[in-house]
Amino acid sequence: MDNKGWSLKGSLLPLLLLVSDLLLCQGVTSLPICPTGAVNCQVSLRDLFDRAVILSHYIHNLSSEMFNEFDKRYAQGRGFITKAINSCHTSSLSTPEDKEQAQQIHHEDLLNLILRVLRSWNDPLYHLVSEVRGMQEAPDSILSRAIEIEEQNRRLLEGMEKIVGQVHPGVRENEVYSVWSGLPSLQMADEDSRLFAFYNLLHCLRRDSHKIDNYLKLLKCRIVYDSNC
């Protein structure tokens, strides 16, 4: 890894500090939300949504920065964007494309959809971190963002499971998710093919994190504030 591009001492640090302050104010510096051994610990649904919205927005910001940096460093003049359209592994999940479509979906279905998308990213994010470590001349800022996103995605998933548990207590949702099979593409010998695989994965991550961020804001308004927001 070289030190070119942004680093944690650069543009990412203010964002990390801001989110850290927000999470401290909300009491969510770590998950599980309840301390180990706590009995009958209960966090309000409003607080759970507040934390989830903060995390989802943070993840989307990180994924956007990571994609933009990768695009600027590796993808210029390669025509990747035209090939990346509609080629995400989560395309098998029927997700609303805009706010108007999302508003037509029952909140229970939208909550379960968020869970499925988050679970669909567990495996690719794990391998993204591993493969970025092995990239020649990859800036530390891309790796640091990949590591942070993987961790925060797990935290957001756990928080969403708690939200679903409060909205629909006693109902267990099947752990349905979209399987990712892109690891061989990240390891291809052909440079163009390998770089496109990374580009496409980061493009999809930015897309899905934006959708989740919007869905959560909509659900918070609908469930917590009875759509009066």
Swiss-Prot record:
Q: List the disulfide bonds.
A: C34-C41, C88-C204, C221-C229
**Record's protein name:** Prolactin
- The gene behind this protein is PRL
Q: Which GO terms describe its cellular component?
A: extracellular space
Q: Kindly list the biological process annotations in GO that this record carries.
A: female pregnancy; lactation; positive regulation of cell population proliferation; positive regulation of lactation; positive regulation of receptor signaling pathway via JAK-STAT; response to nutrient levels
Q: Per UniProt, which keywords does this protein have?
A: Disulfide bond, Hormone, Lactation, Phosphoprotein, Secreted, Signal
**What PANTHER family would the database entry show?**
PROLACTIN, SOMATOTROPIN,PROLACTIN
Report the main location listed first in the record.
Answer: secreted
Its signal peptide is: 1-30
